[in-house]
Amino acid sequence: MWERLNCAAEDFYSRLLQKFNEEKKGIRKDPFLYEADVQVQLISKGQPNPLKNILNENDIVFIVEKVPLEKEETSHIEELQSEETAISDFSTGENVGPLALPVGKARQLIGLYTMAHNPNMTHLKINLPVTALPPLWVRCDSSDPEGTCWLGAELITTNNSITGIVLYVVSCKADKNYSVNLENLKNLHKKRHHLSTVTSKGFAQYELFKSSALDDTITASQTAIALDISWSPADEILQIPPLSSTATLNIKVESGEPRGPLNHLYRELKFLLVLADGLRTGVTEWLEPLEAKSAVELVQEFLNDLNKLDGFGDSTKKDTEVETLKHDTAAVDRSVKRLFKVRSDLDFAEQLWCKMSSSVISYQDLVKCFTLIIQSLQRGDIQPWLHSGSNSLLSKLIHQSYHGTMDTVSLSGTIPVQMLLEIGLDKLKKDYISFFIGQELASLNHLEYFIAPSVDIQEQVYRVQKLHHILEILVSCMPFIKSQHELLFSLTQICIKYYKQNPLDEQHIFQLPVRPTAVKNLYQSEKPQKWRVEIYSGQKKIKTVWQLSDSSPIDHLNFHKPDFSELTLNGSLEERIFFTNMVTCSQVHFK
């Protein structure tokens, strides 16, 4: 028995060490199988961490869990699963989330991790000195009386030597009523760890915005804006954060919010990406048109109107076609909507882009439209004006037409696609410049990286895509910090700095430090979605945590969800369900 246990500890440590070394070398692989039904994954710093909902931890950790079942196996599990189980529901047979291990199995794995790191276990066949591995956390199925949902182990090191380990137990319950006293929690911590004094730290999270599905056919976006506030000491349970707290806005924005004020601009960006993909791959997947008329009809009408005006006035004329592209955003704060409206100074090429991007559905449309335009220029029917600074092929032809001579352009191959892509890029760049400079959020120097014409056209499109995401972030935050210009400016600079150094990432959470006094109206009269107190003394690893939240922080467990019989006529719950988390720990000294 002991020999088998020793071998298990050696093997477990060896597998974890291999994974850790691969990560340090930048080799990222899928979770590895430790046993037939057990897998281990290494969560790097900055990656989504399931423990963040409980401990606010975001460092590198090992996560141990049950191997997800193949879809065909889920039907068999359904038959075996009892009604009382808290393990994730397999009823759909799809999108099965993280799965938990029995509490007993989790304790065994924590024991192997502890054995392997104990310097007193000299009989183990492990190369010395033992490498201190990242913390190990095991998902548990809450099958014990305490409702354990996580077990964790974190090493204590002194001068690069492993001197002990902290063992964590996390429990979670769904309650309609909860009763807890801060002094009782402090006394529990003192008694458990033989302490005379303790420190308490409060934390509250207020959900300012979270997108919801419009209907059954449109899924909710991943946009979420939350205000996190921490302070010390915490004086009572559910204390309102004092103005001396530290506050941070956590912002994650997915572009293309259907109800957002930028929906029309996002549609133009999508069309730009379609053209860029077509130019790169030779295959173009056209968007559904927004116009009832064909692209050729719209362009011909546009040229006829310009001809009647003898080529003048087209830039100042209010373009009703462009106006129709504006999305109805009645649900969005009107003042925010007014900040980003279609520019009134669109030149010929920009108006042409608006018409063609909303109506072109084929390569033939492109060829026919540009044929009409070039013929009108050659005949001298129109002499449209353009903004300065454009290097597009169409702008060169227009400038040549002023002098009565034009280069011959063969509208074949990728040329029509590139021509429309160029004028779209010019138009969108000017849109973004107009907003950022108009709102005094950035200068041309700040934006130079995003609008530089010196890089190849695919890179230009990619950078414009980044710039659009920055704009989406700002517009999403404006309802909350619009009156605080310095906050909007700071957020702009944070985003610009990030995207000059990193690829586009709409899952990235941007963090904006704020003064509680500047956002007190957002939280002082509101209930937090999450409230937590941490009690510790000396080593911050040794702590007791109590948390209350209005949604389950445990992604591998299902809790009771109310059915329709429990809902009132207006759809609200008579009694709200709360989730209480408790984290306790014990310290083991090796030396």
UniProtKB/Swiss-Prot annotation:
Keywords: Cell cycle, Cell division, Centromere, Chromosome, Kinetochore, Mitosis, Phosphoprotein. It holds the Pfam family Zwilch. One of its GO terms (cellular component) is RZZ complex. This is Protein zwilch homolog. The modification Phosphoserine is found at S88. It comes from the Eukaryota. Gene3D superfamilies: 1.10.287.1880, 1.20.58.730, 2.20.25.230, 6.10.140.520, 6.20.270.10. Coiled coil: none annotated. Component of the RZZ complex composed of KNTC1/ROD, ZW10 and ZWILCH; in the complex interacts directly with KNTC1/ROD. Belongs to the ZWILCH family. The keyword Cell cycle applies. It is found in: Chromosome, Centromere, Kinetochore. It comes from Pongo abelii (Sumatran orangutan). Essential component of the mitotic checkpoint, which prevents cells from prematurely exiting mitosis. Required for the assembly of the dynein-dynactin and MAD1-MAD2 complexes onto kinetochores. Its function related to the spindle assembly machinery is proposed to depend on its association in the mitotic RZZ complex. The keyword Phosphoprotein applies. GO terms for biological process: cell division; mitotic spindle assembly checkpoint signaling; protein localization to kinetochore.
